[in-house]
């Protein structure tokens, strides 16, 4: 029964804790805080809670005469905790006439409590405040102790005061409506207080974790009627009464700790900062991961890191760290920023080491630049009575998974250390199985606390095999075995990580598990490596004995499904045990529970690691079952039926494999190490390592029955071991390898070789350990030779020969392959590098990757190496963070034959500047130029697929990061191994692009192509089979329709080039910063609308595809629509929108499966923007956000019903949600009921500027909001059948309305120069103004005088908006410019004058843009780095041409001219990096090796070409034949429309030619954009300019 409890703080019983105490709450406030005015303050979310409404009504009813109750509601979220909100509340209090006797009642979470407390501390120089916390975090933390504050833009809680409340009234009932994640978030502070102060409460929390999580996870959303407004609200509801006693106690006990600490240290001078345990590091993570991560989640990670820091210092035991980590996980909190679910929640944000340390430096506990951290001594007790100083070096080590090991230089030769390794993994796992199957209680001591045993304990618990509890502050595990009778199938898969021992033992145990009415099987699974490790021999034996087992993925490996309604028969069982002795132990331990006595016969050769089998048999004997070894049959055992009887206590011997590392440290450093609890009586084979390996290598060994001491010889005098059979201790071979690496002798013929055999099983451990050692030793300069069942290590002549692992780019890390033994072995060798150098020599450390993998067997190894053995360690930013910046991930193109892979691969390579490899051609090169078709005829498809896979894996391995395009054969996806390789490459950041087109067109084409191998089956069947594989293996796709004309072909090329540039990040997707718009398409099929799509998009920065309006949602149809749109609009950015019905669209609200598929199509097609509704299920939102790649996300919310005014909390909540999701743009659409709704919207817009915001009102009353919206305003077009939303306007309508409001000022623009009578500039610009509804006017100003232009226009026309400058003023006008663009400076002329305001002007030149954009628009890639350029002529325009070709990436530009003497001064006047080569003679052209694919003619067009110049030109035109794209020549002259240069280029040499009219219009459109900020409607302008 929950009683009202009162907790004293600072000498007063003011903290009251209870359940459903609203009567007491009202009575306490009114009785003990008499006042004329009570002010209840809360946020709008709390107003929806019935319990709050009940409290307000009761408060009103209980007011004494002469008192009044005011309520003040603020918007929810951290943004309300501001100076502005505080000021608004203070103004409200003053207006309402509140005086010094006012009592503030803060009802809410930490934001409300902090802010209202601060208002109370300053209003009228301090009024009374009562805290009524409603969140768990507020109840146990922020409401207690009197800390109040607000946030500023420079940091949280920087402005505030200590102001103790009169009461803190804690009612557990508030937690019923607390959201699940907030509930779990609060548990971090609860666990923290128990951790630092109350060990008994920590133990109680441990035992109630599953109850808590079950109840909290069972929370449901319910609809309730608001008692104050009669509105229907939806709130979360948790069944608190199902865990009321636990919740009450956890809140009460946590409050007691904080109250006691605050009472001792109110102003946080010493003891109170112990409450900051987990916060020093946690706050640093929070600073980076906010708002995605919550405070408690970051503190949880911080607690684990700070506990690991204490363990690193040798203060906290590994067991205590494991307990803390386990309890946090049990309550649903993260323990590492790298947990998969937490990374997805925080949107894969990086937490760089330097940023974390920088954030940690801003901490009130610090003293100057010295950082302080709370150090834990044990669960329930801190080290010292305040935080301790910690170095950045130690923090770096704790905060990263990459470790720097410095040379073992300062370790004294006479050092003697005693090291106790953790309990044996092998014995720990066996003891847990035996105790779970046994009857009675068994106290297991020195159990290894590691990933392996954690998985085993979890499995035993989930299978209800035993009751598990802890004693001795978690050091002793108490197993209450039930004799196997309670083993029951569990519904969830048992995840075992990379725990091979647990997986093998549990496979046999699964055969003894009973079915339940709802569950007839169990699933065992693990991580990626576990799903490669073998388990087949064990499964085969169990299957043969009657247990039904299925493989769920790879044959012979986890995951497996074990059916629990089959039986473990017993009798004779044959088992192949040449790979792992764990198979044998697994069956041995479960055999007594079979239906019949078991005879276990080991077949297939000599069993591996027989000592481990002997260990199992000896342990079974301790638990009451005697195994008899056959005297007549080798390797055969008899196991009787029976039950284990648990010994009252079982002490786990230390792990002998782990003991090899400190013992080897002694050997390598010439020091002495003693392991006091492993001797010659050990059950473990690895106990022989010191005697059989280190002693013959020159070490002094002292071994008793229970201890081992190793003293190493002087450093550098270890001897190689000619031969050692390590079969009895296979896991120790890695340690032997690193010792052998620095062993040498005086025999010139020995090559310092140590030969190790008997370890073949080590190839199928956590990794292929023999290969791993060979690979990593080579990085240190140590050579090895692999043997069939072992390895030879060729030691170095001197330790000084050891190298720091590095490559051409600098130091590299030692890869540990997620293998604990690899990591620990190389931590020793790493310290020997440079250890013999002079003391003052700077020595580079060795980097070890993935240090946390040692957690499998020795989580505290690094702590022992550092604190016990004296090694200097540091942490470092992961190498991949720096190396990946420089890598150029390759592109793999897959798809059916005839999908266009060969052509598009060339385009791809050209667009990115990558190298191209056709894998079919590479195949032929590697097979003596035999064609694929011939190879298939001779060897069959299966052999070809094997070779194809091998080649693919090789090129990815060697060139996956080096900027290649790999064009594959259509059938590469037929091979499962190839599919895996493709998926692995995609998941590593590579680009796998699925190229596809209409299958019917493909079939027609393929049936008529004799050059390709014949299909055995019909093409359609092949497509049906492969289609899913293509989609599964690719992370991007491109729909490439067949092209029937060259113009279509070039349009497709431009479309693809922009697509590939977008998905690879070469082309950045920009969110417009100024006024901009997107048009909303409402067609059901774009196929028939291609002619209209360009004019529909005039004036827009993006186009929205309303997918919910499309005729069907199939992947092919939708992809085709995107392709059509890109091609027709020259790849204007696409907004991909699927609008659901409840958000005003056509898409069914609950069709989430189809919705996911559509979003997948969008992201694979690399759409620039994706509209994500904020009302969708959270899992869909996070899935899209985490897969978005370069796509920008628009978080949208629409109020079609007009339910919410713009000052309603709904919009604030949705905006905060959008911030949490970290969308790129927020889009809110309301409904204007009256004109005032637009004013409220503008206030909202004005106060929400931290994300680009599209905010508009629907209906005609809301039109003004569309005019005032300044980023990506949704618009319609007169060419659309209907608008996408009520009240939508066209771009022209918006501009005209905005002009009428004074938003756009009418400008006068001119073309200046002489003669300009025939200038097309006025019609060019005025056409654009008319179409876009702009008020400007473009006219002619004819003059030869730049002075006159300055007087009349620059100085004399107040409406001057810009000038297009033509001859003869392009040079003269420059003197009047205040700024010149780079283009104007280099080209040496100005053709565009841009007003900057205040009578200042910028001179620009857009001729080069006219050239560049005209070329790109005609199929020239945006980057042509592998092609040279050519300029014909050396006049003024040639400078713009050279500038343009350089901007396209031409590495070399040739220039020819009739008068060659003009070339040299021209070239010398331009930057040397343009690499311009002037051609003096025709002969020199023959020696040019480069392909020339792009040219610009700048010679007069009205005269015939000089013969010499013509000869040079023709020799260059020949060089276009082998360019990577259709060679293209631009004619700079506008008239005549066809020039002599164009004729000869096109007719004789098949160059594509571009008329000068296109350059004219492109440069004019560039001017248009610079002057107006709008993209010019190119097609309409071009038609107007060229219509005569």
UniProtKB/Swiss-Prot annotation:
Gene Ontology CC annotations of this record: cytoplasm
UniProt KW Oxidoreductase keyword: yes
Residues bound to NAD(+): 43-45, 78-81, 109-111, 114, 134-135, 156, 174-177, 185
Gene3D superfamilies: 3.40.50.1970, Aldolase class I, Dehydroquinate synthase-like - alpha domain, Enolpyruvate transferase domain, Leucine Dehydrogenase, chain A, domain 1, NAD(P)-binding Rossmann-like Domain, P-loop containing nucleotide triphosphate hydrolases
Keyword flag DNA-binding: no
Xref: Pfam families: DHQ_synthase (PF01761), DHQS_C (PF24621), DHquinase_I (PF01487), EPSP_synthase (PF00275), SDH_C (PF18317), Shikimate_DH (PF01488), Shikimate_dh_N (PF08501), SKI (PF01202)
HAMAP family: EPSP_synth (MF_00210), Pentafunct_AroM (MF_03143), Shikimate_kinase (MF_00109)
Name the UniProt record assigns to this protein: Pentafunctional AROM polypeptide
Organism encoding this protein: Saccharomyces cerevisiae (strain Lalvin EC1118 / Prise de mousse) (Baker's yeast)
Gene: ARO1
């Amino acid at each position: 029964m929950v009683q009202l409890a009162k907790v004293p703080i600072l000498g007063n019983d003011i903290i009251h804790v209870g359940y459903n105490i609203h009567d007491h709450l009202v009575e306490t406030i009114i009785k003990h805080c008499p006042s004329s005015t009570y002010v209840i303050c809360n946020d709008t979310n709390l107003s929806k809670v019935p319990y709050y409404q009940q409290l307000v009504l009761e408060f009103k009813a209980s007011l004494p005469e002469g008192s009044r109750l005011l309520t003040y509601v603020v918007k929810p979220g951290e943004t309300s905790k501001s100076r502005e909100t505080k000021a608004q509340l203070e103004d409200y209090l003053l207006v309402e006439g509140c005086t010094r006797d006012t009592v503030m009642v803060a009802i809410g979470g930490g934001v409300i409590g902090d802010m209202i407390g601060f208002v109370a501390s300053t209003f009228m120089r301090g009024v009374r405040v009562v805290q009524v916390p409603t969140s768990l975090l507020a109840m146990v933390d922020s409401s207690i102790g009197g800390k109040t504050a607000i946030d500023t833009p420079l940091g949280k809680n920087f402005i505030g005061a200590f102001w103790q409340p009169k009461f803190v009234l804690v009612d557990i009932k508030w937690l019923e409506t607390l959201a699940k994640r907030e509930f779990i978030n609060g548990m971090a502070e609860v666990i923290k207080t128990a951790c630092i102060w109350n060990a008994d409460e920590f133990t109680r929390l441990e035992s109630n974790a599953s109850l808590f999580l079950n109840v909290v996870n069972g929370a449901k959303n319910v609809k309730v009627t608001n008692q104050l407004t009669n509105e229907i609200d939806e709130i979360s509801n948790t069944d608190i009464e199902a865990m009321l006693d636990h919740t009450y106690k956890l809140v009460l006990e946590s409050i007691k700790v904080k109250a006691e600490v605050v009472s001792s240290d109110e102003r946080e001078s010493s003891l109170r900062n112990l409450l900051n345990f987990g916060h020093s590091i946690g706050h640093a993570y929070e600073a980076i991961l906010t708002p995605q991560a919550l405070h408690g989640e970051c503190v949880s990670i911080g607690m684990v890191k700070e506990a690991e820091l204490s363990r690193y210092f040798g203060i906290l035991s590994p067991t205590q760290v494991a307990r803390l980590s386990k309890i946090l996980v049990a309550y649903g909190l993260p323990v590492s920023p790298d947990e998969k679910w937490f990374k997805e929640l925080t949107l894969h944000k990086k937490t760089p080491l330097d940023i974390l340390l920088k954030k940690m430096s801003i901490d009130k506990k610090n003293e100057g630049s010295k950082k302080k951290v709370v150090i834990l001594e044990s669960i329930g007790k801190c080290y010292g009575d305040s935080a301790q100083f910690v170095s950045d070096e130690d923090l770096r080590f704790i905060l990263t998974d990459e470790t720097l090991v410095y040379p073992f230089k300062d370790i004294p030769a006479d050092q003697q250390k005693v090291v106790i390794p953790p309990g044996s993994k092998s014995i720990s796992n066996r003891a847990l199985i035996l105790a779970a199957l046994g009857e009675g209680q068994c106290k297991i001591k020195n159990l290894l606390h590691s990933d392996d045993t954690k998985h085993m304990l979890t499995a035993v618990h989930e299978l209800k095999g035993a009751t598990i509890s802890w004693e001795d502050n978690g050091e002793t595990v108490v197993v209450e075995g039930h004799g196997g009778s309670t083993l029951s199938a569990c519904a969830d898969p048992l995840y075992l990580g990379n725990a091979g021992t647990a997986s093998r033992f549990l496979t046999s145990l699964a055969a003894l598990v009973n079915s339940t009415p709802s569950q007839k099987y169990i699933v065992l699974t693990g991580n990626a490596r576990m799903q490669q490790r073998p388990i087949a021999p064990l499964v085969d034996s169990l299957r043969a004995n009657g247990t039904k087992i299925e493989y769920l993925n790879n044959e012979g490996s986890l995951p497996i499904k074990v059916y629990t309604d089959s039986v473990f028969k017993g009798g004779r069982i044959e088992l192949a045990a040449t790979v792992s002795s764990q198979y044998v132990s697994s069956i041995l331990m479960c055999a007594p529970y079979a239906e019949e006595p078991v005879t276990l016969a080991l077949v297939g050769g000599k069993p591996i690691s027989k000592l481990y089998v002997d260990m199992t048999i000896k342990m079974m004997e301790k638990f009451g079952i005697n195994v008899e070894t056959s005297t007549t049959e080798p390797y055969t055992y008899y196991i009787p039926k029976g039950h284990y009887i648990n010994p009252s206590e079982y002490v786990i011997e230390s792990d002998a494999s782990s003991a090899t590392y400190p013992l080897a440290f002694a050997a390598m450093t010439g020091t002495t190490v003693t392991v006091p609890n492993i001797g010659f009586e050990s059950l473990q084979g690895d106990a022989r390592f010191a005697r059989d390996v280190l002693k013959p290598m020159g070490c002094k060994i002292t071994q008793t029955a229970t201890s081992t001491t190793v003293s190493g010889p002087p450093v550098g005098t270890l001897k190689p071991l000619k031969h050692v059979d390590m079969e009895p201790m296979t896991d120790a071979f890695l340690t032997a390898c690193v010792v052998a690496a620095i062993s040498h002798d005086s025999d010139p013929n020995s090559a310092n070789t140590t030969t190790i055999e008997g370890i073949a099983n080590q190839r199928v451990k956590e990794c292929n350990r023999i290969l791993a050692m060979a690979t990593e030793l080579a990085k240190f300069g140590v050579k090895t030779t692999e043997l069939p069942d072992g390895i030879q290590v060729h030691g170095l002549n001197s330790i000084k020969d050891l190298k720091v692992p590095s490559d051409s780019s600098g130091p590299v890390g030692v890869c540990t392959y997620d293998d604990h033994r690899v990591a620990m072995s190389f931590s020793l060798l790493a310290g020997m590098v440079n250890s013999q150098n002079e003391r003052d020599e700077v020595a580079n450390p060795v980097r070890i990757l993935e240090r946390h993998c040692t957690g499998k067997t020795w989580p505290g190894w690094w702590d022992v190496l550092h604190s016990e053995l004296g090694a200097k360690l540091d942490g470092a930013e992961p190498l991949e963070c720096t190396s990946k910046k420089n890598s150029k991930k390759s592109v793999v193109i897959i798809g059916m034959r005839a999908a266009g892979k060969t052509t598009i691969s060339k385009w791809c390579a050209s667009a990115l500047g990558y190298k191209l490899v056709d894998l079919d051609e590479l195949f032929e090169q590697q097979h003596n130029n035999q064609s694929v078709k011939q190879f298939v005829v001779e060897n069959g498809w299966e052999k070809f697929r094997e070779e194809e896979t091998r080649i693919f894996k090789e090129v990815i391995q060697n060139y996956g990061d080096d900027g290649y395009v790999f064009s594959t054969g259509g059938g590469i996806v037929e091979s499962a191994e190839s599919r895996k390789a493709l998926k692995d490459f995609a998941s590593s950041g590579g680009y796998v692009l699925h190229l596809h087109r209409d299958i019917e067109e493909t079939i027609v084409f393929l049936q008529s192509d004799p050059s390709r191998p014949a299909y055995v089956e019909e093409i359609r069947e092949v497509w049906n089979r492969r289609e899913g594989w293509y989609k599964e293996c690719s992370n991007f796709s491109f729909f490439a329709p067949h092209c029937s004309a060259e113009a279509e072909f070039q349009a497709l090329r431009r479309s693809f080039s922009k697509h590939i540039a977008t998905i690879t990040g070469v082309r950045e997707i920009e969110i417009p910063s100024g006024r901009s718009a997107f048009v909303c398409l409402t067609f059901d099929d774009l196929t028939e609308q291609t002619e209209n799509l360009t004019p529909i998009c005039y004036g827009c920065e993006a186009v929205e595809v309303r997918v919910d309006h499309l005729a069907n949602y199939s992947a092919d149809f939708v992809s085709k629509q995107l392709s059509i749109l890109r091609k027709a609009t020259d790849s204007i950015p696409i907004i991909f929108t699927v609008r659901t019905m409840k958000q005003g669209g056509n898409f069914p609200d609950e069709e989430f499966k189809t919705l996911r598929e559509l979003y997948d199509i969008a992201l694979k097609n690399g759409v620039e923007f994706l509209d994500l509704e904020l009302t969708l299920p959270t899992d869909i939102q996070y899935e899209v956000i985490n897969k978005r790649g370069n796509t920008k996300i628009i978080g949208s919310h629409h109020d079609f019903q007009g339910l919410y005014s713009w000052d309603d909390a709904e919009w604030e909540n949705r905006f905060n949600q959008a911030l949490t999701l970290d969308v790129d743009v927020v889009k809110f659409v309301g409904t204007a009921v009256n004109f005032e709704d637009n004013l409220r919207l503008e206030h909202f817009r004005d106060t929400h500027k931290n994300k680009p915001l599209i905010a508009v009102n629907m209906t005609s009353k809301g039109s003004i909001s569309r005019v005032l919206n300044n980023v990506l305003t949704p618009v319609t077009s007169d060419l659309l059948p209907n608008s996408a939303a009520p009240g939508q306007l066209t771009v022209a309508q918006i501009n005209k309305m905005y002009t009428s409001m004074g938003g756009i000022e009418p400008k006068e623009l001119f073309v200046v120069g002489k003669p300009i009578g025939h200038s097309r500039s006025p019609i060019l610009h005025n056409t654009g103004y008319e179409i876009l509804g702009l008020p400007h006017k473009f006219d002619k100003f004819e003059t030869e005088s730049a002075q006159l232009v300055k007087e009349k226009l620059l100085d004399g026309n107040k409406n001057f908006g810009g000038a297009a400058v033509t001859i003869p003023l392009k040079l003269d006008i420059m003197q009047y410019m205040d700024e010149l663009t780079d283009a104007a400076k280099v080209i040496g002329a100005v053709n565009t004058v841009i007003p900057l305001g205040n009578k200042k002007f910028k001179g620009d030149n857009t001729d080069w843009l006219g050239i560049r954009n005209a070329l790109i628009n005609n199929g020239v890639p945006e980057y042509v780095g592998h092609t040279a350029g050519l300029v014909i002529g050396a006049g003024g325009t040639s400078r713009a041409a050279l500038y343009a070709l350089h901007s396209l990436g031409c590495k070399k530009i040739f220039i020819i001219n009739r008068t060659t003497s003009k070339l040299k001064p021209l070239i010398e006047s331009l930057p040397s990096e343009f690499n311009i080569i002037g051609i003096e003679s025709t002969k020199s052209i023959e020696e040019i090796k480069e392909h020339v694919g792009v040219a610009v003619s700048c010679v007069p067009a009205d005269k015939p070409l000089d013969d010499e110049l013509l000869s040079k030109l023709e020799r260059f035109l020949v060089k276009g034949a082998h360019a990577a794209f259709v060679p293209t020549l631009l004619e700079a002259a506008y008239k005549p429309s066809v020039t002599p240069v164009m004729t000869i280029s096109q007719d004789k040499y098949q160059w594509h030619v571009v008329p000068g009219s296109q350059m004219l219009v492109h440069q004019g459109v560039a001017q248009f954009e610079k002057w107006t900020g709008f993209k010019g409607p190119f097609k309409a302008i071009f038609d107007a300019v060229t219509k005569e």
